Amino acid sequence: MESERPDAHFHDPFARKLAGAKGDEIVRTLKDGTSMAWAMIVRTQVFDEIIMAEVGTDGIDLVLNLAAGLDARPWRLALPQSLQWVDVDLPDILRYKLETLGDAKPHCSYEAVEADLTDATVRRELFARIGARSKRVLILTEGLLIYLTDADVAALATDLLAIPSFTRWVIDLASPRLLKMMTRSWGKAMASGNAPFKFAPPSGTDFFRELGWAERAYHSTMEEAERLDREMKMMWLWKFIGRFYPARMREEFRRMSGIVVLERI
């Protein structure tokens, strides 16, 4: 785990406890699970940095974390006490997380909302309630969109845009090329768990522009991995081969995977 490295970028004292034996089993049995952990490390660190920057300098007063899963950022990040943080996920997931965290105290105001985000009525009512109590909201959908259809993502984007205080939205985004690679490696395993990979729009972030959300910042996973010294094995070979590709192809590789900050237009 990243937290246990001497040069760790982040320290999550709750990660191993939350992951439990099931988490170890997934990493052990999933093809290339350990060797591909670099991408999750990079994503986590970049999300951390974006959150701290948005909260610290851009006046965000509430973070809405959709499909929050086992994310323990309210407990491990040095967030201001005045910040409101709302986790949304299915009941079993949130209850397991809170029971596992036990007496640990979050650094900010924290609320766990049990909700099925696939229910449009429930989703819209939740967004309206959150929007009414905040001035500037940062939305997080870390690790979520890739499991949704284009129509699902479009509906979510539309519902988020309907709330004036929802100003920024942080996503992770895959390209069609990466989706094919991931499907070849892990597609059967993910499909057997009822979580097939789906969303990787050919138009990239333009998909969201058409829905009222513009790209504010794009953090290439490959570039961030180099910055953080967490590159995948054989990346040097990818870089060498890339020198011989035209600029258009190099840009396609750069945007194969990224963390994106969107803002309402």
Q: Where in this protein do the model-derived segments appear?
A:
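Core SAM-dependent methyltransferase catalytic element
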Residues: 230-265
